[in-house]
A protein has these predicted regions:
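General marker for long, soluble alpha-helical cores
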Residues: 1-139
């Protein structure tokens, strides 16, 4: 599975990937068997060590129907990107953000605090709901 992302091209830290790059990366991850998706996200982070969270956030923005799957797999594979991905979820699908953050926390309790904080920062009105959900998901 190594080198899945070699044809994507360079993505500089702090620079958003192009639409074409987002589409290519999404296709690679989405078309992989579910059992390989976490490994692909890790490989993406290895290939683009300073941009992994930003790239995954761009993928969520471009594919809101898959936001939950991408966010949960990211919490499992790349917990250091959980906050950035949760913030993208809160922007793209705010009505599902608490539920998705809860699933992220159940997948990886270490990602719970960062995900919850990002959701609350993006949507302060949801603070109580997020706090209750996180307490239940990752006591």
């Amino acid at each position: 599975m190594a080198n899945e992302f070699t044809q994507i091209g360079n993505i500089e830290a702090g620079t958003a990937p192009t639409t074409e790059q987002v589409d290519q990366i999404y296709e690679i991850i989405a078309n992989a068997p579910e059992s390989e998706q976490a490994d692909l996200i890790k490989e993406l982070a290895d290939q683009y060590p300073d941009s992994g969270g930003e790239i995954l956030s761009a993928i969520i923005e471009a594919n809101p129907d898959d936001a939950a799957d991408i966010a949960i797999t990211t919490a499992e594979a790349l917990p250091e990107a959980a906050a950035e991905v949760a913030a993208a979820v809160a922007e793209v699908v705010p009505e599902a953000a608490t539920e998705i953050a809860t699933q992220m926390a159940q997948t990886n309790p270490e990602a719970a605090q960062a995900a919850a904080q990002a959701i609350v920062e993006a949507n302060p009105e949801a603070a109580a709901e997020v706090a209750i959900a996180m307490a239940e998901a990752a006591p």
